[in-house]
Amino acid sequence: MAANRIRPANAPLSKQKSPAPHWRSKVVRILLKTVLYFLIGSVIWVTVLKFVPVWFTPFMIVRKFEAISEGRSSKIYSDWTPMSEMSKEAPLSVVASEDQLFPQHWGFDFKSMVNAFKHNFRGKKIRGASTISQQVAKNVFLWQGRSYIRKALEAYFTLLIEVIWGKERILEVYLNVAETGNMTFGYEAAAQRFFYKPAASLTRNEAARIAAVLPSPLRFSAKNPSAYVQRRTAQIARQMRMLGRVYINNL
C-alpha cells in the first residue's frame, strides 16, 4: 500500500473554487414564488367577488378615515342592490356618460387613451380616459393615486374582471361602488338620499343627474344641481335616448 503523500509545510495551497452565488438564486426563487402566489390569490379574489356582493372598497375606507380625521360624520351610505332590481335607466346612464364603448371593448378604450394623452400633452386641463372596467378595477382592488405600479396593477385587474366577471357583473359592481356624493356610494344610496326613492324607481332624468356628478361627486351635487350639472344631465339624457335600452341588453 502506497504511503500517504505529505504536503510540505511551505507548499502553496491549491486554488479553491469560489462558492456559487446562492443568494441570487434564492432571491429569484422568492420573487417567482411571490409573483405566483399573487397571481393565484388575485384570481381567487376576483372569482369570489363575482358571486359575493362588494360591501366595501378601499376607497370607502379612505373616505371614512378622512372624515374621522376632519371631525365629520364618518357614516358611509351604501346599499348593495342587484342591477336587476334597479331601474333600467341606471346602467344606461353610466354607459352613456362614462363609457359608450363599454359593450364592445375588452376593458380598454385605446382611441380615447391616445386622445387624452394628446390633450394632456398640450398642457390643457387633465382629461381621463378610464373605462368603466378600469374604474371598477381601481376602486375595488387598488388604492387611489398615480404611479406606474398602480396603473400596471389596474390593467391586470381590468383584464381579470373582463375575463372572469363579464360585462354585466362589472356594470353591476360599478353601479354599487361608484362614489355618487359625500360619503355616498352607488345608485341605490344616491336614489334614497337625493330623490327619496329606491333605485328601481329612478326616472331617466334622475339617473342621468346622478351620472352627471360621477366625475367629481364631492364638487357637484345630484340633489342640488348647479347649472353645469343640469346641462350635463340634459346631454346624458339625450345620449341615453340615442343609444336606447337595447344597447346594453346583451352584455
Predicted regions, residues:
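Juxtamembrane regions of bacterial inner-membrane/periplasmic proteins
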Residues: 2-251
